[in-house]
A protein has these predicted regions:
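Acidic carboxylate diad motif detector
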Residues: 1-43
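Positively charged, helix-rich recognition surfaces that bind polyanionic ligands
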Residues: 16-19, 31-36, 44-236
């Protein structure tokens, strides 16, 4: 909903929407000074929770220098990995992801309970919300972890290079679908993109067909044939 003639107001921890009275809300953070509220988008999760996304507009010249000096830049390379989501060129502490697999047993248990309920009954609706809350918890854990990891990387490095891999195509593969969706690599890459832009830094997308694994890191020689079973590449 767009802001027109003061139809949307935000005061402290309250918000007023068109055709709705004042509603108490939990504000995530305060907007920066000098910004103007442009629109509000209200969404509802399957668990029954409501969220309001407030869009503010303004202009800032910060971090928009014409010439960037990367002579002393700290550079990080990131490669997608099925186990652990990613492999980094520098040592970065990571906790074990796979939040779906961690909660898979509990989710399956709640889904079995739902399958035994009579469709349309009160117990069915109640159990539906329990299943939705399980999915919501998994999404929240994954998003929180990726936000913290991407923030740590953008604070430490000036240039981040990532593989421009087609995540949708990989998720359609027979054996990779669950791992690809559970890792959240596409979401992680998007977070890096806008967070680096905020700080005036750069995200470089490397072509998916670039032979980075076949190329020697010292002399640059490319090994033409490199099997997936070869985990160590010794350049001659």
């Amino acid at each position: 909903t767009n802001v027109v003639n003061g139809n949307i107001l935000v005061e402290g921890s309250r918000i007023r929407l068109p055709k709705v009275k004042w509603i108490t809300m939990k504000k995530h953070r305060e907007p920066a000074e000098g910004l103007r509220l442009k629109s509000v988008t209200v969404s509802m999760e399957p668990s029954g929770k409501y969220f309001a996304s407030l869009l503010y507009e303004g202009y800032s010249c910060e971090n928009q220098a014409a010439d960037k000096d990367y002579s002393n830049a700290k550079i990080l390379g990131i490669d997608y990995a099925m186990q652990g989501m990613a492999v980094f060129s520098e040592e970065i502490e990571m906790e074990e992801a796979g939040f779906f697999r961690k909660n898979e047993k509990r989710l399956a248990r709640e889904q079995r309970k739902l399958s035994r309920c009579v469709k349309g009954s009160r117990n069915y609706v109640r159990q539906q919300k329990k299943v939705a809350r399980c999915h919501e918890k998994i999404r929240s854990q994954r998003r929180d972890y990726l936000h913290k990891l991407s923030r740590r990387i953008t604070d430490q490095y000036d240039i981040v290079a990532v593989e421009d891999i087609d995540m949708k195509a990989m998720s359609r593969c027979l054996h990779f679908g669950k791992s690809v969706q559970d890792n959240g690599y596409g979401m992680f890459r998007n977070m890096l993109d806008y967070k680096l832009a905020w700080k005036g830094k750069e995200l470089v997308k490397v072509d998916r067909f670039f032979p980075s694994s076949k190329k020697c890191s010292k002399c640059g020689k490319i090994k033409k044939e490199l099997k997936l079973s070869e985990r160590v590449y010794r350049c001659t």
